[in-house]
Amino acid sequence: IPPSRSSDCRCVPITLIVGFCIHPTGLSSVAKMIDEHPNLCQSDDECMKKGSGNFCARYPNNYIDYGWCFGSDSEALKGFL
């Protein structure tokens, strides 16, 4: 079940454990925000480009299309996984 009543809702993480849901009509502004956020990622390469780490750890929630950047040897990554 999605985190909101709407199956069209997409989760947008703000921090490691906090986020909000948005309807797809607002996704272009959210995509821009995620591009600008230093720790949100879709790939390891994106983390390296942002300088936020070298590993993109995906959220375990299928409704979140992004991950969080970590250094591959960081203690925070071990806690996230």
From Swiss-Prot:
It comes from the Eukaryota. This is Albumin-1. The lineage of its organism: Eukaryota, Viridiplantae, Streptophyta, Embryophyta, Tracheophyta. The keyword Disulfide bond applies. The keyword Disulfide bond applies. Three disulfide bonds are probably present. The C-terminal glycine may be removed from A1b. It holds the Pfam family Albumin_I. Keywords: Disulfide bond, Knottin, Seed storage protein, Storage protein, Toxin. GO terms for molecular function: nutrient reservoir activity; toxin activity. It comes from Lupinus angustifolius. InterPro entries: Albumin_I, Albumin_I_a. A1b binds to basic 7S globulin (BG) and stimulates its phosphorylation activity. The presence of a 'disulfide through disulfide knot' structurally defines this protein as a knottin. Residues 27-34 form a propeptide. Disulfide bonds: none annotated. Signal peptide: none annotated.
